[in-house]
């Protein structure tokens, strides 16, 4: 008796009409807030596989959504004035698909504050707990340090334009008060929004507060902040000054480090055409 061919027991292929890709109008799931969810009840999967890979040091699988985002995107903003267009940009931040589909970012955007016609624009990295709760950039102790810096310059928040490089707080599993810096991908997705802000505000100088902001604006890679500060750079046809983030000043008592930040602020004031007194020039210098 001959041996017949073994039956094919492989499962049939799925129907052609079945697709794992979500519908175009599907939004990412609402993430729990610290007030609503105890830390032991947050499902890590709700933050997306990509974030788990980031936290575990694994490169995520590349998809169409991982394609490079052009730095120079032309947004169709409503309004005639810069203020109206900035308001339109604020609405776009909430609904723009590249940001909306980022599972590694939380749900609440934190846009800019201050004067949309300011000569000085300051850019910090991303919202943390305080910023997400209060809805403004640089809140909490870091914000208090910024306010003190501005007061020493003869300014207040209403005199500058303050914004984030990344407009959403980077997410973490079981996140309550802890924060994390934005990833390179989150910065890449967010950069066209910042560029549009700079083009609308048209400041005389942009101040990059911290290494992350500097890396995003200048595309400086792993160049340390110490090598970037002390001079002016150019990005988006605008002079850029790099200095330490106010949060750094909270962690150091070194007067020489504080003097470095103040020297940067003096250069920013000169670039913006602001008057500088002899008293201001002598701040944080050793007493004779």
Locate predicted features:
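A polyanion-binding, active-site-adjacent surface
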Residues: 1-288
């Amino acid at each position: 008796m001959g041996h017949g061919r073994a039956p094919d027991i492989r499962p049939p292929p799925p129907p052609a009409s079945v697709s794992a890709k979500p519908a175009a109008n599907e939004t990412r799931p609402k993430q729990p807030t610290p007030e609503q969810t105890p830390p032991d009840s947050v499902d890590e999967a709700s933050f997306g596989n990509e974030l788990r890979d980031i936290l575990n040091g694994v490169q995520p699988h590349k998809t169409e959504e991982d394609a490079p985002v052009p730095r120079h995107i032309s947004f169709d903003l409503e309004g005639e004035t810069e203020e109206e267009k900035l308001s339109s940009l604020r609405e776009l931040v909430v609904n723009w698909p590249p940001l909306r589909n980022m599972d590694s970012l939380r749900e609440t955007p934190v846009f800019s504050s201050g004067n949309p016609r300011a000569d000085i624009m300051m850019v910090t990295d991303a919202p943390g707990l305080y910023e997400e709760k209060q809805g403004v950039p640089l809140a909490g102790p870091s914000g208090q340090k910024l306010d003190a810096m501005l007061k020493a310059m003869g300014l207040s928040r209403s005199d500058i334009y303050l914004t984030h490089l990344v407009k959403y707080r980077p997410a973490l599993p079981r996140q309550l008060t802890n924060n994390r810096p934005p990833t390179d991908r989150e910065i890449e997705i967010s950069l066209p929004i910042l560029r549009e802000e700079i083009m609308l505000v048209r400041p005389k100088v942009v101040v990059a507060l911290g290494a992350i902001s500097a890396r995003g604006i200048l595309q400086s890679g792993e160049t340390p902040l110490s090598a970037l500060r002390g001079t002016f750079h150019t990005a988006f046809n605008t002079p850029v000054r790099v200095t330490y983030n106010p949060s750094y000043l909270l962690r150091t008592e070194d007067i020489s480090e504080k003097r470095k930040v103040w020297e940067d602020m003096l250069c920013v004031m000169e670039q913006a055409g602001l008057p500088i007194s002899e008293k201001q020039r002598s701040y944080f210098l050793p007493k004779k």
